Amino acid sequence: FFIVFFFKFYQTKDLKKLLLITFILIIGCYVYKNHDDFPYYHLTYSLNLSENSFIIGTGIFSHGFRTFSSLFYYHSLLYMPGINFYLFHLGPFLILVFFNISILLELRERFKSSSINFSYYFALLSFIIINVVFYRIVEHGTDRSAQILLILIFLQFFDILYFQKDRKQNLIKINLFLIMIFLASSMKAIYYLYILLVP
């Protein structure tokens, strides 16, 4: 997502705004503490993924090793030389930043084009609810990030179904919609029910 949106912002000369918002919000990464289960199994699972290339039979160690999540694989990508595992808790924060930037840009575009409709008010209400209810990164396990992405999925769904008339933009939104569905559903095993939204 970040690569796709990076190129989108780079083409529209909004890269400076993206970097400014990210820099301002990165302060939150130092303020918030980790999830309560982070030392229990988030850290050990992600560290095991980043340090070992062949993992089999680890489910006997603890409950956390039996519940896979794409968020843990994402955390293992944040393992960097010199920094080691100190950025593992950054994953949910980056998803929250991605949501805020996406919604703010969507609201700005709709306000400039004077296309204020149901989708605009749904995006505005979603922005308020997510930032009031989900602002505590300490509560973000594997489920909160998927719920944040689910709000974006519904926004894309309404735009595709009711408001998007341009065929090229519609195709881009459908691709983004499918990627977000599979990403949100892979964050927790029960969220595979989101795949029912695909047809």
Residue spans of the language-model regions?
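Membrane-interface alpha helices of multi-pass inner-membrane proteins
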Residues: 134, 172-199
